[in-house]
Amino acid sequence: MGDWLLEAATAYNRDSYEQRDRYASHLLIPLETMRTVIRWSMESIPDEVLIGFDPNPERPNPEAVEEAFGPPQSSFSGSGFLLGEPHIVNVGDSYSVHHVPEEWTDGAFSEERGARGSRFASFLHSHPNAYAHPSQADAEAADWTEGVEMILGVRFSPAPLGLEWYDQEDGHRRDLKPEKDEELPVLARVAGRKVHGFELIGYLRNGEGVNLLITSPEGFPIGLDL
């Protein structure tokens, strides 16, 4: 992935800092975790991938981050700790991807927990050639997420029929790409396709946005001097 992800994380975190007042909570994502998530999302194209996480209980958020972004006004499972290791839960289309296979579910509670009846606190799924904006299926699945629900939009070309990219202006957009003058840069290549950019958002099951930060292993946001 080269150095573009470091540049993208720096730009993303600066935006997170500038917009910190619009969010009631924040979540720290280690850079290498983000790198893995991006790789899995690219490798799964044209399908979506569902990834599960638990918080890392050995990595509380650094005090400097809490001071800069303020104490969270909304609580969620894993709040106050870095995001833990990623695990691929499922790969499929926009509806089937939200089904959690039996090996990841807690049988005693799966019926009560609905579509997300698994042991993971937080989830991320990819949107191939689509904005990072929750669909109706996404919103219904998020009703059972106790932590943070995240979406990674992936823009690529050439696109299979039915997965063409359409520009839209509505909604809150959070780009994850380097600050370059190129309108359509090529960040990576996979299976004969060019990957041009990403979007990344997080939200709680009540629809409230979560401010995401990409960090060092210790939890310090890349590119921010706190």
Where are the model-predicted features located?
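Conserved beta-strand-loop surface patch within small alpha/beta domains used
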Residues: M1-S122, P128-L226
